[in-house]
Amino acid sequence: MQGQTTSVSFDGREIRLTTGRYAPQAGGSVLIECGDTAVLVTATQGQGREGADFLPLSCDYEERLYAAGRIPGSFMRREGRPPERATLISRLIDRPLRPLFPNWMRDDIQVVATCLSLDERVPADILAVTGSSMATLLAGIPFYGPMAAVRVGLLGDDFVLNPSFREIERGDLDLVVAGTPDGVVMVEAGSNQLTEQDVIEAIDFGYEAVNELIKAQESILKDSGLTQIKPEKPDLDETVPSYLEKNCTKPISALLKEFDLSKEDRDLKLDEIKTNCAEKIDSLKDDNAVKKSITTNTKLLGISFKALTKKLMREQIIKDGKRVDGRALDEVREISAEAGILPKRVHGSGLFQRGLTQVLSTATLGTPSDAQEMDDLNPSPDKTYIHHYNFPPYSVGETRPMRTPGRREVGHGALAERAIIPVLPPKESFPYVLRVVSEVLSSNGSTSMGSVCGSTIALLDAGVPLKAPVSGAAMGLIKEGEEVRILTDIQGIEDFLGDMDFKVAGTEKGITALQMDMKMTGLPIKIIGEAINQAKPARTHILEKMVQAIDKPRETLSPHAPRLLSFRIDPELIGTVIGPGGRTIKGITERTNTKIDIEDGGIVTIASHDGVAAEEAQKIIEGLTRKVHEGEVFTGSITRIIPIGAFVEILPGKEGMIHISQLSEARVEKVEDVVKVGDEVTVRVREIDNRGRINLTLRGIPQNGDMQYYPQPTPTPVAPLM
């Protein structure tokens, strides 16, 4: 099958969409390519789920190692559980796609994106997002699309569209923006403390390119002879919503104005109103239309009650400018922060609370060997900063089985991780591998931003010299027609009733991470800019509270944290330190009880809980790699004797040999007549042969114990020895 191919060019980079050729039994499919990266995206619609009160949409990004010319390293030589990055890309597809389906839709929809080939210069994620829209359109699924996504980088002062992996690494911005003809529907970014204006301009720059990809999808649909199926709301039974509006509006509205109520009390009173209403309906005659509807659909009362509560809350915010807890639209909840709340067995800890949201973060310092190896398709180095986010059921007063982290936990952890990375100290000056774990102890909105704040406190408590502290706030939005209200620091109920969840993290200087999700089909850049700017004073206020808890890194590390020494050796001498079969480096680690890591560039990192042991290991390695010159004089101990001479350790780990003829001016019959093992002697380097062997002499050297060292390289400690 030939299929149809449409191309769109950006700055000399061409994106190709091929339809009608692959996966003919899928509802819709497209092969989307850029360079040598190719992603096959399919969308298929199933039957509706009976009794479902949500959209059963699943989005899966599948990596195949053959895409990078590799064979899996597992025993079965088959791909196993998706790596973390695949999970994050699955979320990246889901987030802009989900709000474009009608909220009444209950059909199973499955989108599968499979990376068939990966070019090291072209990331596959944005291709998968755009492809998901094209496949959905071709499948004939009711959909408020088209939707497309692009990536924006910043090199110097110039924005770069769809940058390569290397350009992303070198640049100060990694921003993904997805949009529809109505506006922006999703934003995700990490940046190197960029200003609010820079980020807004980057979103605007990206959205212009999004429109080109939207036009390409519309063209493909037209050329295929297909018509986009626009969602049409089915006729719904309005008897129950009408009854609730008539009988429950007053008590709900009155309750929403009781600003002093706690979340728990408000929820209980709402349940009371719903229960009273249900009892009234139950007392109606059996042939009453409302009672019949409730009997037919047992979930209808709960769904309709939630919808009415949501409507009344939104009206209160739009008309009165007051939220359910009485806060002004730009007001942050009460904040508390505390550092070092756990014993120093934990290297660093911080407790951050904002309203009813409470997060405990811990920081652990590890050695270079603790870095996380990234076993995925992307050409990425090992991770030296890791953030894990846990959301146990008790945090929302519920019970459920404790399982492995889900997509939400992985996504929130990645966002908090991205927010901190720009302020981490350089590896050369602080070579620790860092792991932060954020335990959500109580949740009422914005736990991911609470994790960012808790991480900062824990890292400073652990003695990590951050460039600047980072805080975060979640922004919300209520939009009714032309009326727009932006909410600062949204809580759980406002996330439910609102149209946007916009998380912004950064330092006093600028933004380090942001993530925007919509429940609308698009939002103008102007409103997005207002939300970003409104987040700045909130972040500053939160930072001030955090600094009161801890304003700089601890001067001393936990006594239970490893001590690291780092210095550089000639890369050509790495083999000398490692030795045949690793014998030399193994001997050093056993002798000094340390852990030693050597990078390809020659950076040696020694880890030990004993600073003296680390220094001893450093001296041995420096001795092994130090160049010895003819004529130098050393004092060392006799380590072993052979019939033709004696070996002397002239430097830690480095030996030379005194030939029997060089032991004395006089003739020597037996080596032991002059020296024995353990004797301390002063020797001169007579020559270094072409195999690097050091030949020594005792002739003419006064044996008075004097030592003369060739100038030693000055070690560069990366963390203080304590």
Curated annotation (Swiss-Prot):
Protein name (record): Polyribonucleotide nucleotidyltransferase
Catalytic activity: RNA(n+1) + phosphate = RNA(n) + a ribonucleoside 5'-diphosphate
Subcellular location: Cytoplasm
E.C. number: 2.7.7.8
Domain S1 motif: 631-699
GO molecular function per UniProt: 3'-5'-RNA exonuclease activity; magnesium ion binding; polyribonucleotide nucleotidyltransferase activity; RNA binding
Cellular-component GO terms for this entry: cytosol
Lineage: Bacteria, Bacillati, Cyanobacteriota, Cyanophyceae, Synechococcales
